[in-house]
Amino acid sequence: MDVRLRADEYATTRAILKSAFDMWLDIIDVDVAIVGGGPSGLTAARYIAKEGYKVVVLERHLAFGGGTWGGGMGFPYIVVEEPADEILREVGVKLEKVEGEDGLYTADSVEVPAKLAVGAIDAGAKVLTGIVVEDLVLRENRVAGVVINSYAIEKAGLHIDPITITAKYVVDATGHDASVVTTLSRKNPELGLEVPGEKSMWAEKGENALLRNTREVYPGLFVCGMAANAVYAGHRMGAIFGGMYISGKKCAEMIVEKLKNNE
């Protein structure tokens, strides 16, 4: 194969910078900012974006997917139960029925986050990696956006001021640490918010508590996924992920309803 590739350093640099600046100018004001690109965050992003709203997902690591990639103790499979399996089927994930267990399936732990991310992006959400949310924007007793910085800057310990993304709603989908709600609680003790953390593993109880705990914790701030159980002291579940996906979908539905009602 005789191919000659055009490679120009100036053109490459200019193209990257122009695309990046155009992108940032487009997303500094959004309908929903989702902090955390794990299973619940990506699920919420897809359902909200499908309704035509502007959504950005902010993930501190260079890879989205949260704890899904490693499956259970490094074995590359996760478990999902009905009816959450339908959420994965919508993005084309291949599921294998667990023999002798009604309504239980396994899924490839690499395929799942990849297809969830593609589903969110194809629906119109913007997924950014390497971005850390270090604080929240508050306006008149309401969360009104996120304060962001480069994760590389944070890791290097450099004293560099952040920038902001304004949003009608913010979602804490940061997993076990519930870092967004924790930050709001720590910086604003007068709000009376507490984050007791999750309880020890009890999969069935944790899965069902997760759905109850997915809610608006403060005006403009929702919590979903494992962050919800951390905020409201639910049990952890391990490598069964159905509750995470349903939590993300429930969070999306609640936010979409508020957006449609201009709340």
Swiss-Prot record:
Gene3D superfamilies in the record: FAD/NAD(P)-binding domain (3.50.50.60)
Positions that bind glycine: 236
Bound cofactor: record note: Binds 1 Fe(2+) ion per subunit.
Pathway participation: Cofactor biosynthesis; thiamine diphosphate biosynthesis
GO biological process: thiamine biosynthetic process; thiamine diphosphate biosynthetic process; thiazole biosynthetic process
Catalytic activity: hydrogen sulfide + glycine + NAD(+) = ADP-5-ethyl-4-methylthiazole-2-carboxylate + nicotinamide + 3 H2O + H(+)
Highest taxon above the source species: Archaea
Cofactor: Fe(2+)
Keywords: Iron, Metal-binding, NAD, Thiamine biosynthesis, Transferase
List of residues binding Fe cation: 161, 176
Positions with a binding annotation for NAD(+): 40, 59-60, 67, 133, 159-161, 179, 226
Molecular-function annotations in GO: iron ion binding; pentosyltransferase activity
Pfam families: Thi4
Enzyme Commission code: 2.4.2.59
Subunit structure: Homooctamer; tetramer of dimers.
PANTHER family, per database record: THIAMINE THIAZOLE SYNTHASE
Family: Belongs to the THI4 family.
Record's function text: Involved in the biosynthesis of the thiazole moiety of thiamine. Catalyzes the conversion of NAD and glycine to adenosine diphosphate 5-(2-hydroxyethyl)-4-methylthiazole-2-carboxylate (ADT), an adenylated thiazole intermediate, using free sulfide as a source of sulfur.
Protein's name according to its UniProt entry: Thiamine thiazole synthase
Gene symbol of the encoding locus: thi4
